[in-house]
Each structure stands twice: as structure tokens, then as C-alpha cells.
Amino acid sequence: MKFKHIVWDWNGTILNDAEACAKAVDDMFKKRNLGRVTREAYRKKIVFPVIKLYQESGFDLEKEDYQVICDEYIENYLKYSAETTLQKDAVFVLEEFRKKGLIQHIVSASGSDILKNQVSYYGIGAYFENILGQADNRADSKVDLARRLIGLTGCKPGEMLFIGDTVHDYEVASEVGFHCALVSNGHCNAERLKATGAP
């Protein structure tokens, strides 16, 4: 199968921000006396939609407003992500795909404003035809965004390769019919990714 489109996840796949996310979550756990979260512990725990992470970790969502929790995470994340970089060779790979005539897009659980600001900051916006993020900062499922991308491109799902770094990326690809490839240097550890059976 010759792919026509490459669909990228952003956080952890192109942007090397797993450490920043782990620190943001760690601050939230410490505040609530729920223990500590290292980078490796985070990579074992992270699930989408992210509300599941909070529910499974002991956050009392009957007493705490979920939107306030999301806002707290974003405040922490923006503090720690200021020093993040792109993944090694990310620009090289983007350029190679561009040279091959592949059309590239981003589908992200990140809020659209933060996503577009980060893409602009790193100067790589020209590589992407569509940059799709969430309307809010709740890090919900990306399935609807993937379906929206299919509509925008008019391309058959089977002609699209989704490259991500989480089990959820595999789930999204499977749900909408994309092919999927996963990288293990992002938000999920290799053991969890191997269990999906994706390359």
C-alpha cells in the first residue's frame, strides 16, 4: 500500500514533551497527597481520555470541578514545556516525507490554540496541510478529529498512515481505518505499545 497522507500525533511524537507532562501531573499528585509521578511511571499510567487517569489515580471528581483540574494541568504544563524540544530527527523525517510528495497533517488531543502556537514556535507549520487540535484543554479522544480530517481531505482512510506514541493513537487509527505506526520515545512505554501489535 502506497500512502498518500501522513497523520501525525503531536505531543510525544513530534514534540519531546513527556517529561514536561510527567512533571505537570506530578505537581497535581503532590498537591492532593496521591504520591509522586516519575517520567517512567507517567508512561505506564497515561490513558485517554485523560479523565480516566485522574479517576483511576484517586482524584475526587465529585468534589473537584473537572475543568478546574484541566486548567491546573495546563498551567503546570506550560511552565514545564517552555524548555521542550522537538524529537531527534523530527524535522529530517518531515522533510523526507515532503520530498516524497506525502501530504502531512497533525491530529492532537492538545487544545487547538496551544497546539498551533507550539507548531509556529518551532517553525514547522509549513509541513502540514491541516493542524487539528481540541476545542478545549480536556485531552479527550481524537476519534472525532480523525474523522474530521478524512472529511477535509476526501482521502480514503486506508491511504493514510497515523504515526503516534500512545495506545490511544492505535485505538484512533483502528476506529477510523488508518494504518498505524507507533514510536516508543514518547508518552507510552514500549511494553504497552507492543501489546497493540502495531509496528
Tell where the protein language model's regions lie, with residue ranges:
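Conserved Lys-Pro-Asp/Glu-containing loop-to-beta segment of HAD-superfamily phosphomonoesterases
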Residues: 2-5, 142-171
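Acidic, Mg2+-coordinating phosphoryl-transfer loop and its flanking beta/alpha structural elements
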Residues: 108, 161-199
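Structural recognition of alpha->loop->beta junctions
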Residues: 122-132, 192-199
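N-terminal helical cap/lid subdomain that shapes the substrate entry/recognition surface
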Residues: 3-92
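Surface-exposed amphipathic alpha-helices with a cationic face
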Residues: 91-99, 150, 170-174
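Short, acidic loop-to-helix structural element flanking the phosphoryl-transfer center
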Residues: 78-106, 112-116, 143
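A short, structured active-site edge motif that brings together acidic residues
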Residues: 42-45, 124-140
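Conserved H-loop
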Residues: 35, 125-129, 156
